[in-house]
């Protein structure tokens, strides 16, 4: 509960569900971009074997690690910029 009604209003159940759905869409989009990017880079279009060979497996592992690391760094920078922008406007930012 807010002190003297000065706090932010609590989100409704519908708002919470919408936020979770939005987050799920973003996670699915990130996964799809990761899968497409790393498969294009590491796995040839003409499959020679039923399983990944060692080189393909290592490439996919490294590609995934780099993709996720880059995504985290971009997210952190966007949050910092959002907070800085929110501070300049004198109000709460989106992030």
UniProtKB/Swiss-Prot annotation:
Subunit structure: Heterohexamer; composed of 3 copies of TIM9 and 3 copies of TIM10, named soluble 70 kDa complex. Associates directly with the TIM22 complex, whose core is composed of TIM22 and TIM54. Interacts with the transmembrane regions of multi-pass transmembrane proteins in transit.
Lineage: Eukaryota, Fungi, Dikarya, Ascomycota, Pezizomycotina
UniProt GO MF annotations: metal ion binding
Membrane topology: Peripheral membrane protein
Compartment(s) of residence: Mitochondrion inner membrane
Domain note: The twin CX3C motif contains 4 conserved Cys residues that form 2 disulfide bonds in the mitochondrial intermembrane space. However, during the transit of TIM10 from cytoplasm into mitochondrion, the Cys residues probably coordinate zinc, thereby preventing folding and allowing its transfer across mitochondrial outer membrane.
Nucleus among keywords: no
Protein's UniProt name: Mitochondrial import inner membrane translocase subunit TIM10
Keyword Transmembrane belongs to the record: no
Disulfide bonds: 38-63, 42-59
């Amino acid at each position: 509960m807010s002190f003297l009604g000065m706090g932010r209003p609590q989100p409704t159940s519908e708002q919470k569900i919408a936020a979770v759905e939005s987050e799920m869409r973003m996670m699915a989009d990130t996964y799809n971009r990761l899968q497409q990017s790393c498969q294009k880079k590491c796995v040839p279009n003409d499959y020679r074997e039923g399983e990944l060979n060692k080189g393909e497996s290592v490439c996919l592992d490294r590609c995934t690690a780099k993709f996720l690391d880059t995504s985290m760094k971009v997210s952190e920078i966007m949050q910092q910029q959002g907070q800085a922008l929110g501070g300049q406007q004198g109000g709460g930012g989106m992030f």
